[in-house]
Design a protein with these regions (language model features):
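Short beta-strand edge/turn micro-motifs at domain boundaries
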Residues: 18-53, 101, 105-124
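Surface-exposed, charged secondary-structure patches
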Residues: 1-22, 66-95, 118-128
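Pro/Ala/Gly-rich low-complexity, hydrophilic intrinsically disordered segments
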Residues: 41-75
Length: 128
């Protein structure tokens, strides 16, 4: 809720290619500069639908939530992040088959609500 961590997500297009991105940004407490700490995305066969308006959400300030600790399955490469005020969390998981998942949760004053849940299928093996 204090603005020191943010997440952006949206569509990208490059020529005939389409996809999406999700990026987690963290403010340097000394310099004030925002730098990315997680960048994720994938290509899509069809572009995401364009929203009528840009959407914004902000965590509720006040009592801090209890943040559950998650563990990955055996073989998962997992990273977990938490904003300093504990109102925004993110989890990045890469499974042994190279499928990926990024989940972002935001404190609404009562619960940590999932606001982004990106799942990417494993890559298709190249045909010989």
């Amino acid at each position: 809720c204090d603005g020191n961590v943010g997440v952006t997500t949206g569509a990208w297009q490059k020529g005939p290619a389409n996809g999406y991105f999700t990026t987690v940004w963290l403010r340097d407490p000394k310099k004030g500069k925002m730098t990315w700490v997680l960048d994720h995305g994938d290509s899509l066969a069809t572009p995401r639908a364009a929203p009528d308006f840009i959407e914004s959400r902000q965590a509720k300030c006040g009592a801090r939530p209890a943040v559950p600790i998650e563990a990955g399955n055996q073989g998962d490469d997992m990273a977990v992040g938490l904003s300093p005020d504990q109102t925004l969390s993110w989890t990045s998981t890469v499974r042994p088959d190279q499928s990926r998942r990024v989940t972002v949760r935001l404190w609404d004053g009562k619960d940590m609500q999932t606001v982004i849940d990106n799942q990417v299928a494993p890559p298709v093996p190249a045909q010989p």
